[in-house]
């Protein structure tokens, strides 16, 4: 079974309400389904690391990719609930960030759960009841401190969340990313990009991270 892939993001694909990426690893192209939210954050022709859940059927196999091991494991917990298949699991993770989903399940927030495509009241109730105890293992998925906490308002990148998600998909951890954004905001690479310049922030962070690892 495939559990992890690292390769080059060749292209994104969409089939109906499903979206994903063609990931080239050692000369082989893998079609991996992602949440739409994750797919929109990918940069063309970039290196990409994904934690994989593989579903094997008689007519073939399907790969589902996630930017972190915790999110992949949360997906596996979701689809272990009766009536929640892989598409519903992806819909939940598209609608809610992992820490928001954990909070909704542990708090029995049925209205929030029902906002995900394909999740009705009965399924939401089943999620809240069946996962009340096991979801506690994901308590570490609490909202992280802001990447820009403590920065002057004119330095705060409005594109910070998108930059963070892209860097995580490239294999950087959250601590490295926070350090990079703070360093760029403090002028480590000259005048910081404007708050809405996602490409500028991403480019500056990648350059800073590359220098730090050299």
Swiss-Prot record:
Q: Where is this region: Domain II?
A: 68-146
Gene3D superfamilies with a match to the protein in the record: 5' to 3' exonuclease, C-terminal subdomain (1.10.150.20), Nucleic acid-binding proteins (2.40.50.140)
User: Where are the membrane-spanning stretches?
Assistant: none
Q: Name one GO cellular component term.
A: cytoplasm
Compartments (UniProt record): Cytoplasm
Q: Where is this region: Domain III?
A: 157-214
Instruction: Say yes or no: keyword Cell division present.
Output: no
What residue ranges carry the coiled-coil annotation? none
Q: Could you give a single Gene Ontology term from the biological process aspect?
A: DNA recombination
**UniProt GO molecular function:** ATP binding; four-way junction DNA binding; four-way junction helicase activity
Entry similarity comment: Belongs to the RuvA family.
Q: What is known of its domains?
A: Has three domains with a flexible linker between the domains II and III and assumes an 'L' shape. Domain III is highly mobile and contacts RuvB.
Know the name of this protein? Holliday junction branch migration complex subunit RuvA
What organism is listed for this UniProt entry?
Synechococcus sp. (strain CC9902)
């Amino acid at each position: 079974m495939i559990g992890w892939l690292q390769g080059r993001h060749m292209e994104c694909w969409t089939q109906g309400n499903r979206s994903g990426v063609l990931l080239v690893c050692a000369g082989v192209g893998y079609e991996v389904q992602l949440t739409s939210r994750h797919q929109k954050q990918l940069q063309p022709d970039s290196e990409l690391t994904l934690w994989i859940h593989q579903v094997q059927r008689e007519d073939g196999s399907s790969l589902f990719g996630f930017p972190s091991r915790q999110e992949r494991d949360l997906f596996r917990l979701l689809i272990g609930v009766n009536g929640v298949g892989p598409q519903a699991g992806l819909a939940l993770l598209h609608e809610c960030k992992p820490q928001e989903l954990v909070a909704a399940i542990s708090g029995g927030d049925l209205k929030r759960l029902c906002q995900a495509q394909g999740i009705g009241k009965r399924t939401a109730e089943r999620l809240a009841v069946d996962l009340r105890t096991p979801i506690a293992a994901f308590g570490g998925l609490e909202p992280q401190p802001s990447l820009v906490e403590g920065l002057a308002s004119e330095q705060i990148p409005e594109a910070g969340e998108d930059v963070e998600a892209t860097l995580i998909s490239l294999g950087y951890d959250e601590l490295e990313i926070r350090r990079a954004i703070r360093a760029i905001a403090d002028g480590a690479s000259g005048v910081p990009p404007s708050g809405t310049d996602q490409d500028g922030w991403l480019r500056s962070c990648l350059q800073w991270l590359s220098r730090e690892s050299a």
